[in-house]
């Protein structure tokens, strides 16, 4: 797919200050280092400024403060990275689907599919499901009984929604994602695991995005709930009864244990783990590989573990770590000895 748009049109769309030829054709996006004629680029971080002088880009998205000394065509904006994100959709090569149902799709008689929806090859839509207008369901997707997909949703091939999964508007779900699988609920009866029926569902708000091979389990009693605007990366696990607040984002391989509650506008970096039945307040940032073992009640940044070191230094630190209990006991003895001596000296001075 080839897209051409005038630089002036991009300026108008962004509300940017245009410096250069408004009729210049823009055919794509690229980094400063790799951009060629016809492509627009952006300068978002100071470390990439060194590429600005020699870039072959047709135009560059710049902050006004970064435009001094650059003689090429530019669009001046407050946030070049945000501007890049906004115009990237003009050049998205993702194929556009057409309304209609592929002849190999299997749809229950009582399922409701809007005529403006697109249902791909070998998709299965079960009894009582409802598919709204302008929804795209890719090939080999499975939509379980009574599940609902709101207007403008997009499901890549091989997405699975079990029964009673309710999805808001404009939700994007990537391949391999599974929503509504049974939660991990068992009780031990004299050494034998007995299963809890997982009778809740899954509810997603509007504008949610879910990455490849991410799993969101259904609730044991009430629904597992994902708020509006939540962004989940690839290979994330959300256990039963978890609640995630609006506009929270999680990077790959995060694991959230059952019944945890995460607030609004939080960010969880890659590999973060949460134990179950804890609460995370709004506005929390958790750094990569952190293990969260108790509730967080104050906004801010939180970390656990040790940062990377050269191997030899790390081994020394690990050896010292094993001695911490012994060192603490020795320190307590020293503190008591110092206190005894100090008290004796004070008594001598008083006498």
UniProtKB/Swiss-Prot annotation:
GO terms for molecular function: N-acyltransferase activity. Pathway: Bacterial outer membrane biogenesis; LPS lipid A biosynthesis. CDD domains: LbH_LpxD (cd03352). It catalyses: a UDP-3-O-[(3R)-3-hydroxyacyl]-alpha-D-glucosamine + a (3R)-hydroxyacyl-[ACP] = a UDP-2-N,3-O-bis[(3R)-3-hydroxyacyl]-alpha-D-glucosamine + holo-[ACP] + H(+). Pfam families: Hexapep, LpxD. It is an enzyme of class 2 (transferase). Keywords: Acyltransferase, Lipid A biosynthesis, Lipid biosynthesis, Lipid metabolism, Repeat, Transferase. The active site is at residue 240. GO terms for biological process: lipid A biosynthetic process. The keyword Repeat applies. Its EC number is 2.3.1.191. GO terms for cellular component: membrane. Catalyzes the N-acylation of UDP-3-O-acylglucosamine using 3-hydroxyacyl-ACP as the acyl donor. Is involved in the biosynthesis of lipid A, a phosphorylated glycolipid that anchors the lipopolysaccharide to the outer membrane of the cell. Belongs to the transferase hexapeptide repeat family. LpxD subfamily. Homotrimer. This is UDP-3-O-acylglucosamine N-acyltransferase. It comes from Pseudomonas syringae pv. tomato (strain ATCC BAA-871 / DC3000). The gene is lpxD.
